[in-house]
Each structure stands twice: as structure tokens, then as C-alpha cells.
Curated annotation (Swiss-Prot):
Native species: Streptococcus agalactiae serotype III (strain NEM316)
Residues binding Zn(2+), per UniProt: H143, H147, E224
UniProt cross-references to NCBIfam families, sorted A to Z: PRK04897.1
GO biological process: proteolysis
UniProt lineage: Bacteria, Bacillati, Bacillota, Bacilli, Lactobacillales
Protein name: Protease HtpX homolog
Length: 296
């Protein structure tokens, strides 16, 4: 059951990434048709922008992410229990030992970052380290180490980059169209008006950014389910992970502001959105995550 869930989540993520590139191609073709006079040129340009954006974000320094989240690196002497759990989970996962960080915050949370296992790092809040027992902490760290092993950080970064590229291209295309940079009316008469293509292009311009955001959220949620399942694979203790999630669910929001890109990295959404904003959670509901673990 565990390996079936892991395989299913991986397949769903691949499908979502394909959908993402289709959205990028659609918005590029739309801008090309409406503004540049060539949908082929717009399509190719959009894909190039998306790839460049993704590659540049992947190679951002781990230190930058840690600095943005007010995390400080600790040694084995400063936090021996925490350090040894990270070491144990990394050994079981067969990845290099990540760097270990602490965030001074009373909320219960943790995250991992790094484009590959060789330059990865794990961070946990002081609140998490104070409240969790060893089994629960192993579940949380196993979750973060699984993100590293499964290259989730890289996938999430690509998703953020592609969503940003779609929004950027849509914004530029809309402005150019609004300020008169669109196709000449003569062009439309020459090709018979092609009303359906025109309507599709305009709808793509409007709806693609929203669709990209929803796909990004779906990818993030699938990776959280996968990391939960992978953590249980490492610890062989589903109850430890379930107990940790129950405590995370009762946690208060982070005490310092967290930007949207960083929020997606945490094991528990640090902003604790409510109402309509919860529809745009980067994380699946904790109740759903617990339910999945109970059915393993």
C-alpha cells in the first residue's frame, strides 16, 4: 500500500508538470498570436523564458533561503538530539548529511531546502524541538529528508518558476495588447477573422495565470502526501508521523512574516489561512494527511 501511494503521487506530479508546460505553451501562443503576429514565435519564446526562469531559481543559494527565514546553522554540540535524528534519517534515506538549522519561533514547523541532496539543509523551529517527542520528531525530520531524497524542492522550485513565467508573460501580453501592440485588423481580415482562435487567445491570456496557480498548489499538495508516506517508509512508524501532524494542526502561525515561496517549503502552512484564502493553501488539510496515513 505504501509503495503504491508513493508511485501514484509521483505519476500525478509528472502529469501536473506536463499540464504546466501546456499552460506555458498556451499563454505563449496566445501572446504570440495577439501581440507578435506569430503564435509559433510566442510559444517558443514562452518555453525558453520558463526554462531559464526555472534553472535560475534552482541554483539560488541555500543560504539565501535560510536567511529569508531567519534560520541559523547549529552544530552537534548545540542541539545533539536534533542533530542525531537528522543524521539517522539521512543515513536511512541514503543521502549525504544535510546542514542543520534552527528558526527561533514558538510555532511548530520545519522545512528543507536545496536543489540536490549534496547541498541540502533542514530547519526546525525552537517550538517544534521543545514540544515534539523523539518519535514525532523523527516523523517530521523523516518528512523533510524525504523531500530532499525525492528532489521535491527542485520540483517545487520549477513549479514556482513556471507559474511566475506564465503570470509574467500574461501581464506583458495584456499590457501590449491594451496599449495597441496587438495584431492589425487587416491581419484578421486576411485570415478570415479567425474568431475562434482570437477568443481562445484572449481566454488563455486571462485564465492561464489562475490555472497555473492552481496547478502549482496541486503539485505542492501531492509532494506533501508523498513526503508523509516516505517518512513512514524511513521510520517504519506511522503513529509517530500521525501524532506529529496532530500537534502541527494545533500550532499557531509563525511569529514572523513568511513569503509565499517559502511557505510552500514548510511541513505545515506557516500562515494558517482561513476562509476563502484556505482554497489557495500550498498544503493539503492535515486531517486528510492523517487519514491517508491511517489507511496505509
Amino acid at each position: 500500500m505504501l509503495y503504491q501511494q508513493i508511485a501514484s503521487n509521483k505519476r500525478k506530479t509528472v502529469v501536473l508538470l506536463i499540464v504546466f508546460f501546456c499552460l506555458l505553451a498556451a499563454i505563449g501562443a496566445a501572446v504570440g498570436y495577439l501581440v507578435l503576429g506569430s503564435y509559433q514565435f510566442g510559444l517558443v519564446l514562452a518555453l525558453i523564458i520558463g526554462v531559464i526562469y526555472a534553472v535560475s531559481m534552482i541554483f539560488q543559494s541555500t543560504n539565501v533561503v535560510m536567511s529569508m527565514n531567519n534560520a541559523r546553522e547549529v552544530t552537534e554540540d548545540e542541539a545533539p538530539n536534533y542533530f542525531h535524528i537528522v543524521e539517522d534519517m539521512a543515513m536511512v534515506a541514503q543521502i549525504p548529511m544535510p546542514r542543520v538549522f534552527i528558526v527561533e519561533d514558538d510555532s511548530l514547523n520545519a522545512f528543507a531546502t536545496g536543489s540536490k541532496p549534496e547541498n541540502a539543509a533542514v530547519a526546525a523551529t525552537t517550538g517544534l524541538l521543545a514540544v515534539m517527542n523523539r518519535e514525532e520528531l523523527e516523523g517530521v525530520i523523516g518528512h523533510e529528508v524525504s523531500h530532499i531524497r525525492n528532489y521535491d524542492i527542485r520540483i517545487s522550485t520549477i513549479a514556482v518558476a513556471l507559474a511566475s513565467a506564465v503570470t509574467l508573460i500574461s501581464s506583458i501580453g495584456s499590457r501590449m495588447l491594451f496599449y495597441g501592440g496587438g495584431r492589425r485588423r487587416d491581419d484578421d481580415r486576411e485570415d478570415g477573422g479567425n474568431i475562434l482562435v482570437l477568443i481562445f487567445s484572449i481566454l488563455s491570456l486571462i485564465l492561464a495565470p489562475l490555472a497555473a496557480s492552481l496547478v502549482q498548489l496541486a503539485i505542492s499538495r501531492q509532494r506533501e502526501y508523498l513526503a508523509d508516506a516516505s517518512s513512514v517508509e524511513l521510520t517504519r512508524n506511522p503513529q509517530g508521523m500521525i501524532s506529529a501532524l496532530e500537534k502541527l494542526d494545533r500550532s499557531e502561525p509563525m511569529g514572523h512574516p513568511v513569503d509565499d515561496a517559502s511557505a510552500a517549503l514548510y511541513i505545515n502552512d506557516p500562515t494558517k489561512k482561513e476562509g476563502l484564502k484556505s482554497l489557495f493553501y500550498t498544503h493539503p488539510p492535515i486531517a486528510d494527511r492523517i487519514e491517508r496515513l491511517r489507511h496505509m
